[in-house]
């Protein structure tokens, strides 16, 4: 707790540099064991050439467990039990499963939230303007992965500078598509159970195993 108060006082006394904010954010999330939040996800541009807005509920438990439950406009479910990841869209009647990468290979934004990877080790940080639609008073930290990623070119974390809570997440992929997540009703260290991240493959669906990425 002493380090957290010291970091907070330092950041309140002057505008933090990008490395200082990244380090403080990493230390904050090292103390968070689980959390939940409502989310709004907007995707625009890229291969779809249109804007889509979806909503749902996110729950995460370290290390590596997460559940993205999309509820509108279409039901979708993305689950990681810490060892395997599952993607399920009921309308498609298909489950895609893959293994969770090791910590030193996990720079996917969602996996950082789940305690995989490390901001100061895996990314180069810089401060940028606050993305449109994000909460006023937040700080925007742009993170460029030091190792090239297939899913995205860079990401922006939107952070509450007083609490270091993540209010939003923006990623841009190689096709120019932008995914923006905004988080509300965030609750931390509530004692989520492992069973909340178990996934049972529904009957009558096709199961596809995704190949490991090189």
Where are these regions (language model features)?
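Sec-dependent N-terminal signal peptides
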Residues: 3-11
């Amino acid at each position: 707790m002493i380090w957290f108060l010291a970091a907070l006082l330092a950041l309140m006394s002057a505008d933090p540099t990008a490395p200082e904010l990244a380090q403080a954010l990493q230390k904050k999330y090292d103390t968070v064991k689980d959390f939940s939040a409502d989310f709004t996800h907007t995707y625009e541009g890229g291969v779809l050439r249109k804007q889509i807005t979806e909503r749902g509920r996110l729950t995460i438990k370290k290390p590596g467990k997460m559940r993205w439950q999309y509820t509108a406009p279409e039901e979708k479910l993305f689950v990681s039990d810490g060892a395997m990841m599952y993607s399920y869209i009921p309308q498609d009647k298909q489950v895609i499963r893959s293994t969770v990468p090791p910590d030193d290979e996990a720079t996917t934004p969602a996996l950082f939230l789940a305690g995989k990877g490390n901001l100061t080790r895996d990314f180069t940080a810089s401060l940028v303007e606050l993305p449109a639609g994000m909460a006023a008073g937040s700080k925007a930290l742009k993170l460029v992965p030091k190792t090239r990623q297939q899913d995205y070119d860079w990401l922006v974390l939107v952070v509450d500078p007083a609490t270091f809570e993540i209010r939003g997440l923006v990623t841009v992929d190689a096709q120019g598509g932008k995914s923006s997540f905004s988080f509300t009703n965030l609750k931390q260290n509530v004692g989520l159970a492992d069973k909340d991240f178990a996934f049972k493959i529904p009957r009558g669906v096709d199961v596809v195993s995704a190949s490991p990425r090189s």
